[in-house]
Amino acid sequence: MNASLATRALLTLLLLLAPLTGLAQPTGIPQDRIFDVGQLKPLDSALKVKVGDPAPDFSLPTIDGGTVTLAQYRGKKNVVLSFVPAAWTPVCSGQWPGYNIVQDMFEATDTQLIGVSVDNVPTLHAWVQEMGGLWFPVASDFHPHGALADALGILRSNGEAERSLFLIDKQGVIRYIDVHDINSRPDLGPLVKAMRELKK
């Protein structure tokens, strides 16, 4: 087994056995710039979709000045939507940088990760720059406020999105959902397993 395969096998094992909380990369953001929201109600919404449903299409502005749509990946790549509740908060500021160690797993399964928040583009742009940049597109569901989050049934009563993951296949069908306790990062193991199932 060459070094690359050994490294991938080790990362896979870690992902399947450990939650992302144990694997997250440092945010790079000084603690005095992070807003501590305290303990929140774990869930505050009702899903409007289920596994097997077609995913709602979307067109969202990204922090690089472009636009991302679900349609642009149809027939080409699976898509993972990673929703976080709010920029500049502790858990969110650790979650997305944590994906840096699994970029090759997304690529190996023909899967595009898209980060989504209901924050506006300037806020997201400043936050991502402070984190040192990310390898995946970051999109704003700010206007109409939370439209995509609402269509999925993950818009909380305070206007934030639930911390959640949606895996959508190349045909636009939802194959995996994790609406997670807003106070902690989700375990990526089950998501990686679902991504690999689509690769078979």
What are these regions (language model features)?
Residues 2-61:
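N-terminal targeting signals for export/organelle localization
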Residues 55-56, 80, 162-164:
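Short loop/turn microsegments at loop-to-beta-strand junctions
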Residues 70-99:
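Short active-site neighborhood of thiol/selenol oxidoreductases, capturing the structured segment around
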Residues 91-134, 144-148:
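Structural microenvironment flanking redox-active thiols in thiol-disulfide oxidoreductases
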Residues 135-136, 154-166:
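Structural micro-motif
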Residues 137-141:
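Short acidic-hydrophobic, aromatic-tinged amphipathic segments that line or gate anion-handling sites
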Residues 160-200:
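Thiol-/selenol-based redox modules, centered on thioredoxin-like
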